[in-house]
Amino acid sequence: MNAKRPVNLDLTKFHFPPMAILSIGHRISGFVLFLCMPLMFYLLHRATASAESFYHLHQLLLHNGWIKLAVWIMLSATLFHLFAGIRHLAMDLGFWESVPEGRISAYTVFVVSFIAIVLAGVWIW
């Protein structure tokens, strides 16, 4: 029997630093935005086609909870991606490159994103 068999690691035992979680979240939010692009373009087309189609879309957004949820998800992904992207650009410029500063900036992005996402939900509903 081979003594060097693969080991199945329990991924729940790993504790990732907040910088890694933020980076993964930035990639996931970018992917969500990519998947939502057809809906965003459709809504933009409907909103700019005519006054009647804008009014119809406005009424749909006011009364349909699923549409509100979809818009909130798109807006949430956009806000998180924006704040995490600003942090990544600042790090490319040489700011927050040490581990303690990176940890603080990651937590700051999480808090600011959470506040902005909650405010977006309040604004939509």
UniProtKB/Swiss-Prot annotation:
Membrane topology: Multi-pass membrane protein
Cofactor(s) the record lists: heme
Chief place of localization: membrane
Keyword Ubl conjugation: no
An annotated GO BP: tricarboxylic acid cycle
Localization terms from the record: Cell inner membrane
GO molecular function: electron transfer activity; metal ion binding
Residue spans, topological domain Periplasmic: 49-65
Ranges that cross the membrane: 23-48, 66-86, 105-125
Pathway(s) served: Carbohydrate metabolism; tricarboxylic acid cycle
GO cellular component, one term: plasma membrane
Residues that coordinate or bind heme: H81
Keyword terms: Cell inner membrane, Cell membrane, Electron transport, Heme, Iron, Membrane, Metal-binding, Transmembrane, Transmembrane helix, Transport, Tricarboxylic acid cycle
Cofactor: how and how many bound: The heme is bound between the two transmembrane subunits.
UniProt topological domain (Cytoplasmic) ranges: 1-22, 87-104
Summary of the function given for this chain in its UniProt record: Membrane-anchoring subunit of succinate dehydrogenase (SDH).
Subunit structure comment from the entry: Part of an enzyme complex containing four subunits: a flavoprotein, an iron-sulfur protein, plus two membrane-anchoring proteins, SdhC and SdhD. The complex can form homotrimers.
Family label: Belongs to the cytochrome b560 family.
Name of the protein in its database record: Succinate dehydrogenase cytochrome b556 subunit
Annotated source species: Coxiella burnetii (strain RSA 493 / Nine Mile phase I)
Upper classification of the organism: Bacteria, Pseudomonadati, Pseudomonadota, Gammaproteobacteria, Legionellales
